[in-house]
Amino acid sequence: MSLQATPDDKFSFGLWTVGWQARDAFGDATRPVLDPIEAVHKLAEIGAYGVTFHDDDLVPFGADAATRDGIVAGFSKALDETGLIVPMVTTNLFTHPVFKDGGFTSNDRSVRRYAIRKVLRQMDLGAELGAKTLVLWGGREGAEYDSAKDVGAALDRYREALNLLAQYSEDQGYGLPFAIEPKPNEPRGDILLPTAGHAIAFVQELERPELFGINRETGHEQMSNLNFTQGIAQALWHKKLFHIDLNGQHGPKFDQDLVFGHGDLLNAFSLVDLLENGPDGGPAYDGPRHFDYKPSRTEDFDGVWESAKDNIRMYLLLKERAKAFRADPEVQAALAESKVDELRTPTLNPGETYADLLADRSAFEDYDADAVGAKGYGFVKLNQLAIDHLLGAR
């Protein structure tokens, strides 16, 4: 088993991950600023194929045009030297005080107009660098007090902004798909579009819903006490998984951004199994495996790069374990015993109507519910087999 990443693995990292200075609400930074050029080269060394960034991760907020052009040129040169690509870009609408009440949904109209301009500029840069997706995380879109935000009006303004972004992308020939990233809270007390379900429903109200999907993040979904793997499966079912952020999280608390698999390990295993093996034996998702984590505040730069490598190692280990799980004849027998594949058989026969079903006495009148109800499904055995493979016991 090789734990060396290749470009085919499509591992990517955000500049804000390895570049996090480890400043939090209770303490100052424990690491200095990381030059984006150095980050690109180091990520290439550990086997990443891509790097992503917010606009302000690369170019400091408020930089003049000449400074911006110089930074972008240097970054582009580093991409050329390393072969890394930019699969996704996003926009920082949460750090500067101007966004304290949001960007697209700020009560202040001038802020909303400024936010849209900021995103349009990042779309231009993303297209220039070959980005394939624009992620939209509305971290400040929300409120702490119910009386402070007209939610219906806020959703109108959200829709207005996203419709304009889609039109701009099409008119410029960018063809960028957009991925909305849900999160229930933090930094706002309550964030609009808090879960994938909210976001997918909202997308249906847009002028070009086919251009919009979601970016699901492990920690964000588990903060809502939701099952990440089930949510990813539903997003795939809707054909709305446009991007994915992988990290670790211990249940519904603050956003921990741990190394992938360093939180709910069993759910991480089932997720990799879904992404790599899918329901039919082939990959269910062909996009980047993007790590959105924060190197722990306790670590120096050596620890930063070790933790970055650990994300890759964890994914590849889980991928290998999931492959062994699926190849195990006892697992296949347990899946059959649990009737997992039978769920893919339509409940109705081809062409069958409700009249036909009502006429079928075996479906109800002659159905022995007590006998069927007495049978076990063997789900615990199946789960134990998964754990055995996860722990390397098989």
From Swiss-Prot:
- What does the record say about how the cofactor binds? Binds 2 magnesium ions per subunit.
Name of the top EC class for this enzyme: isomerase
InterPro entries, per this entry? Answer: Xyl_isomerase-like_sf, Xyl_isomerase-like_TIM-brl, XylA_actinobac, Xylose_isomerase
List, alphabetically, the GO terms of the cellular component aspect.
Answer: cytoplasm
Give the residues the record marks as binding Mg(2+) 1. 181, 217, 245, 292
Any keyword Chloroplast? no
**Principal location:** cytoplasm
Q: Where in the cell is it found?
A: Cytoplasm
The UniProt family comment states: Belongs to the xylose isomerase family.
The entry's protein name is Xylose isomerase
